[in-house]
């Protein structure tokens, strides 16, 4: 059995889909369906069982055996970069992850987990998986950074696989439940379909991020499980493309609309990553050599998925 925490969420459900595509259905999805809208991410997928996050954590903390576990993909977390409840964030993203990690280490279970490019904070170059480059801007980024630091202490002594992925700006199918935290491509598509002008912040041609398609993210996760490699790796494309490029690809698909530029909100000033670009040196050195979709390729594929019933 493979366990996917956050399996009804964005990246988790895409990992479940990637496993299904390989014929793997003996999957336990762990999630919190308090937001009932997330169930739609699982409707077309095949899993063996579902467990609530709190029930799962109780079993993990009590050391209960959950059966023959091949691996745990730990995608479950609070991923809101605007959430400032530090206790909630640390409980969800740090303590929970530590409990799961030790459960896996004691049983020799591969543990593959979601870290984040938010660990790098506001830097504009050298996004390298090393302490001197890490300075998160928000408590979400700090919770991810602190767990990476915890893992670094354990990695040299670990007898089973531990791998963390620093996700950059992931976009693609199954993110609709994320609301304001969904990708720019998702929001632009919604605005166009509602007959509105798609909106970007002023200066969006200068805001550049490493936008990575979620299908590529899932593929990297599965490759690492098969390879058995351990470590903490950036997971982006290695390219920085502008929000304007995302909008251009969205408009090109829809063949209509023009961008309305809106003022940059004061509340985000100083807490906003204006530039991200994954350094893929470690990922490539680990042996992952497949290409990543460009914004034009990924957004076009995503638009086709979003508008498949239109």
Swiss-Prot record:
Domain comment, as recorded: Contains a large N-terminal NADP-binding domain, and a smaller C-terminal substrate-binding domain.
Protein name: ADP-L-glycero-D-manno-heptose-6-epimerase
Protein purpose: Catalyzes the interconversion between ADP-D-glycero-beta-D-manno-heptose and ADP-L-glycero-beta-D-manno-heptose via an epimerization at carbon 6 of the heptose.
Note on how the cofactor is bound: Binds 1 NADP(+) per subunit.
CDD domains named in the record: ADP_GME_SDR_e (cd05248)
Species, as recorded: Salmonella paratyphi C (strain RKS4594)
One Gene Ontology molecular-function label: ADP-glyceromanno-heptose 6-epimerase activity
SUPFAM superfamilies cross-referenced by the UniProt entry: NAD(P)-binding Rossmann-fold domains
GO biological process, one term: carbohydrate metabolic process
Active site annotation, chain numbering: 140 (proton acceptor), 178 (proton acceptor)
Organism ancestry: Bacteria, Pseudomonadati, Pseudomonadota, Gammaproteobacteria, Enterobacterales
Enzyme Commission number(s) from the entry: 5.1.3.20
Binding locations of NADP(+): 10-11, 31-32, 38, 53, 75-79, 92, 144, 170, 178
Keywords: Carbohydrate metabolism, Isomerase, NADP
TM regions (residue ranges): none
The keyword RNA-binding belongs to this UniProt entry's keyword annotation: no
Family note: Belongs to the NAD(P)-dependent epimerase/dehydratase family. HldD subfamily.
Gene: hldD
Alphabetical list of InterPro entries matching this protein: Epimerase_deHydtase, Heptose_epim, NAD(P)-bd_dom_sf
Disulfide topology: none
Pathway, per record: Nucleotide-sugar biosynthesis; ADP-L-glycero-beta-D-manno-heptose biosynthesis; ADP-L-glycero-beta-D-manno-heptose from D-glycero-beta-D-manno-heptose 7-phosphate: step 4/4
NCBIfam families: heptose_epim, PRK11150.1
Cofactors required: NADP(+)
């Amino acid at each position: 059995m493979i366990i996917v925490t956050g399996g009804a969420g964005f990246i988790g459900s895409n990992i479940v889909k990637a496993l299904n595509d390989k014929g793997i259905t003996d999957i336990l999805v762990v999630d919190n369906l308090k937001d009932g809208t997330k169930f739609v991410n699982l409707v077309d997928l095949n899993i063996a069982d579902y467990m609530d996050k709190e029930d799962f954590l109780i079993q993990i903390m009590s050391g209960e055996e959950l059966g023959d576990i091949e691996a745990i993909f730990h995608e479950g977390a609070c991923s809101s970069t605007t959430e400032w409840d530090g206790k909630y964030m640390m409980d969800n993203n740090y303590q929970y992850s530590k409990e799961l990690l030790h459960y896996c280490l004691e049983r020799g279970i591969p543990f593959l987990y979601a870290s984040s490019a938010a660990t790098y904070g506001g830097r504009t170059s050298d996004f390298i998986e090393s302490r001197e480059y890490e300075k998160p801007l928000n408590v979400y980024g700090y919770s991810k950074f602190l767990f990476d630091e915890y893992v670094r202490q354990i990695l040299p002594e670990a007898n089973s696989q531990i791998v963390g992925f620093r996700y950059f700006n992931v976009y693609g199918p199954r993110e609709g439940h994320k609301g304001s935290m969904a990708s720019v491509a998702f929001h632009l598509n919604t605005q166009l379909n509602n007959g509105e002008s798609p909106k970007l912040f002023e200066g969006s041609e200068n805001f550049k991020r490493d936008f990575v398609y979620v299908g590529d993210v899932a593929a990297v996760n599965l490759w690492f499980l098969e390879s058995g490699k351990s470590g903490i790796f950036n997971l982006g494309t290695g390219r920085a493309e502008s929000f304007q490029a995302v909008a251009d690809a969205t408009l090109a698909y829809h063949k209509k609309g023009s961008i309305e530029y809106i003022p940059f909100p004061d509340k985000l000033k100083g807490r906003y990553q204006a530039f991200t670009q994954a350094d893929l040196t470690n990922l490539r050195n680990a042996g992952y050599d497949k290409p990543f979709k460009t914004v034009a390729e990924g957004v076009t594929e995503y638009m086709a998925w979003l508008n498949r019933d239109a």
